[in-house]
Amino acid sequence: MFLAKSIVCLALLAVANAQFDTNYASGRSGMVHLFEWKWDDIAAECENFLGPNGYAGVQVSPVNENAVKDSRPWWERYQPISYKLETRSGNEEQFASMVKRCNAVGVRTYVDVVFNHMAADGGTYGTGGSTASPSSKSYPGVPYSSLDFNPTCAISNYNDANEVRNCELVGLRDLNQGNSYVQDKVVEFLDHLIDLGVAGFRVDAAKHMWPADLAVIYGRLKNLNTDHGFASGSKAYIVQEVIDMGGEAISKSEYTGLGAITEFRHSDSIGKVFRGKDQLQYLTNWGTAWGFAASDRSLVFVDNHDNQRGHGAGGADVLTYKVPKQYKMASAFMLAHPFGTPRVMSSFSFTDTDQGPPTTDGHNIASPIFNSDNSCSGGWVCEHRWRQIYNMVAFRNTVGSDEIQNWWDNGSNQISFSRGSRGFVAFNNDNYDLNSSLQTGLPAGTYCDVISGSKSGSSCTGKTVTVGSDGRASIYIGSSEDDGVLAIHVNAKL
């Protein structure tokens, strides 16, 4: 059976190739994961912040009905009851309005979709009013019956690919994606989201599904909806959650022919570097030399909703909002470097790793509160609103596809490079000051450092950098400064 599935996978490869295109609007790059936000709040954020600040896309939490769990943990969203679009984030009408409003301001929507499994035992009723009996594998809201699932068995050996793909992940009832009826229901669900104007999908737990089955599902999806500004013939961008740190039976290379993958090695490696376990000088060959998938197959991130809580991969090396200086440096590097498709995390604060989003009453999600400096309160972290991050999204948009040039390092933890002649960044992760004359590659003039401040008319709210006629500038980053990074670009010239 595995050989037959492999043949099907290869046959559909040409169809899948269209799924590497992010479908971003021209001149934009980078997406943000607004984790557990409500649809109405995301729509407003697209219009008021994401669009004006150059973000290209927003990843949203699962949109379909999920099991209601005691204490309302975040992970209940990953326990489907049906494919009805009804969650704590809102209903179908609100979701459709959000997608339309975001598309109108150039921000594409990417849905976190869960179809590896259905809810585990205890998930008997859902956010949309549906009921289920997970113990008997009955989910009338779809409907699914026991005929649509793999036999009950637990995953205990990640060196056994059959077990990983055919058994149950932490008790979640494992759907059989090789079943034609299951394929029909999944395609129907995804096509409905495409009709509503989404640009792509993050496929949860892709590692736990056979690549050949995924190839069939992806190959059957309709083209994107041209009513939402997509080019005729466009296909949904597919990014698959495949945790591959090496040493297991399943490899990300089995999935990169079908779509992009979540490159967890990027998160692990960038955390080690900016935590000081590896030196910044070694970043000179950042990319596939570090064991990453190809650039157009890699969705890259500093942290995600799983590994910031110690789940997934990376462990204690993962950087989160709780170590803000290093987190901002790592995020700035990710956005300054051309490798991969970057995704910015936008979190809610937590002390308990099961803790759900802020609520008004223990159940209904609370809206973020916005402060005058663009930051959030009310339990929301909103890293995407940190100046050091959103200004680097603008940096990335400004430099476009220009190559890395003028690399410099001090043989330790101070580095700098330009992106052609359009942007320049410098980093200091040493315990002493960076104070050097460096080649920026930029035209002569005075520039606003978009890390310490922002350009405002003809002035700068932060540090300024003067570039000489030879392209060189005196760069200073004190080891005790709040930010260990400096960035200038041609659109920040004063």
Swiss-Prot record:
Outcome of substituting residue 11 to S: In strain: Berkeley, JP-5, JP-35, JP-55, JP-75, KN-12 and Oregon-R
CC annotations in GO: extracellular space
Result after altering residue 288 to I: In strain: KN-15
Pfam family, one: Alpha-amylase_C
Reported impact of residue 156 to R: In strain: 1420#1, JP-169, JP-186, JP-190, KO123, KN-3, KN-9, KN-10, TN22 and TN256
Cofactor note: Binds 1 Ca(2+) ion per subunit. Binds 1 Cl(-) ion per subunit.
Cofactor: Ca(2+); chloride
Active site annotation, chain numbering: 204 (nucleophile), 241 (proton donor)
Modified residues (Pyrrolidone carboxylic acid): 19
UniProt KW DNA damage keyword: no
EC number(s) given by UniProt: 3.2.1.1
N-terminal signal peptide: 1-18
Recorded consequence of changing residue 71 to R: In strain: 1420#1, JP-169, JP-186, JP-190, KO123, KN-3, KN-9, KN-10, TN22 and TN256
Gene3D superfamilies: Glycosidases (3.20.20.80), Golgi alpha-mannosidase II (2.60.40.1180)
Sequence similarity: Belongs to the glycosyl hydrolase 13 family.
PANTHER family (UniProt xref): ALPHA-AMYLASE
Subunit annotation: Monomer.
Protein name per UniProt: Alpha-amylase B
Species in which this protein is naturally found: Drosophila melanogaster
Species lineage: Eukaryota, Metazoa, Ecdysozoa, Arthropoda, Hexapoda
